[in-house]
């Protein structure tokens, strides 16, 4: 579980986040939604440790991230999978090599085992062997997002953070990506946070939804309550 307790963040004396309180359960998909400038991106950056709040607590399964030592934060970050607004793939690497990249960096498995793991993750997002040898520039935007999801789950993360995962996608493909993230969350028991301004994403999210407005939590509920 991820818990936010009385988080505050300011830039140049202006409060961007004001007394944010929220909790995100394990094995659930959680949507953080708000207009551009609402503070949702700053909130996500605070949660993953890219920004440091001035006040409050950020708890990962009871551990206050803000109080951890540098090496402890590094170990915790290895339990995080990230999906960025752009797919952020390496253009010079094949689809398979993109997914193998974090495995090559952090896994002690043999090369064959790392390759099998990458292939398994790609097949889980419905990308079969023919696509594995292609390069990012040779596949569609929707397929690139699938590769990004496969790469994010390659190291079996406990937490999955998705920053505008539907950016640049048509509504039909966006819904497919939302449902894929949701299904993987439940399959692996991951705590997932999806950050977006797209109200259509609500249709693919079945758990908690938090609306951020002018740096505060304006509303919290489920899809059925929206």
Q: What is the predicted role of each segment?
A:
Residues 64, 112-130:
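Conserved ABC ATPase "signature" region
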Residues 171-173:
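Helix N-cap at the start of a conserved alpha-helix in ABC-type nucleotide-binding domains
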Residues 156:
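Conserved catalytic motifs of ABC-family nucleotide-binding domains
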Residues 135-139, 143:
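Conserved ABC ATPase signature
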Residues 196-197:
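H-loop/switch region of ABC-family ATPase nucleotide-binding domains
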